[in-house]
Amino acid sequence: MTREEWTRDLILTGYVDERGAYTISNIKSAPNGEFGMAMLCVKGEELSIYDTDFSAKPGRLMYTIRLPEITDVRLSTFALHPTLKFTYQNFRWSFMAGFGKKLPISELFASLAGAKTR
């Protein structure tokens, strides 16, 4: 399945909106100590974080984060170490991998970083 087909499927099943902003990433820091692979999906003003595995299909919903409430966004699309970090409800979240320069989710967080970086 191509990335375009996968994006269309996620839109049709309601995981993401028409922007197609999603990625598979590794959780480095989450409030309850979770780690490992996760699927990050953006729909409206919410970032949903789903458990996933190598099938790359969304599993159990772990967190829902309101995008307007995140602060101190840091995004690196450097090929060897792409990372996303932000603060939400006094916790510093961290994810590694899955943030290529031209991906819709990277563009979305880059715009948030420009608007909200302290």
What are these regions (language model features)?
Residues 110-114:
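IQ-motif-like calmodulin-binding regions
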Residues 30-39, 43-87, 92:
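Phosphoinositide-binding peripheral membrane targeting modules
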Residues 90-108:
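Canonical phosphoinositide-binding patch of PH/PH-like domains
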Residues 17-25, 55-65, 109:
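Short charge-dense sequence patches
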Residues 117-118:
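Short acidic DE-rich linear segments
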